[in-house]
Amino acid sequence: MTGVQTCALPISAVASAGKSHRLTTKYAATHYNNAYEFGWDKTDPFRRSADFTLSPWSVTFDGLCHRPGTFDIDELMGMPFSHLEERVYDFRCVEAWSMVIPYNGRPLRDIIKVVEPMGSARYVAFTSVYRPDELPGQASAFSTLEWPYVEALTLEEAVHPLTFATFGVYGDRHLPQNGLPFRITVPWKYGFKSPKFIVRITFTKDRPNATWHRENPSEYGWYSNVYPSISHPRWRSEDVV
């Protein structure tokens, strides 16, 4: 896994690593989630997300780009939700479980090119929403994470054709337990590298300090690519179900 991976994904790589599975049921994929903004239990995102405000939602682009700005979620989609592309990707968690999920969205690179990253931009940081009044996990005195959540990719990874700006799952855009209304899905990486509830995208020259990597770099490598031949320190990658 993560701690032993020190190189970025070659740009020619594809999301074919791992086993092939049938589609996970929508019920399973929406009732067993990691979204620590709602709490640490797998059922917390479903149970505690009813009052989470999905609309209005906007995303700010800043940093090393020629056309910074703030865009409404519908502007980012660029088309009616029903016309978005559907992609089926494996979602692999560092906890040694996985799901096969249909995501609705468009290539992230199509959005990134609109804001025109500068030649000096090498990384992209994704910052998630901070609303402790709506997100009990953020308000909890027992949370060990530093909020808001930040994850990052290299710019090369962010504009890879497989990196997916995601606005829905199973044809449904109203599932905050799955990180909606706007998240990124990166199929060749472990799940925590696919940030949820994104409200800011920042282009940088220096490598951002991502949340989980900052918390425990030996467990959560900065790249965290899924290589079936390279195992996690505590389990074999090929055993991820």
Describe each PLM feature range.
Residues 2-9:
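Short, small-residue-biased leader/transition segments that mark boundaries at the very start
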Residues 13-241:
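Structured, non-membrane catalytic/scaffold regions adjacent to prosthetic-group chemistry
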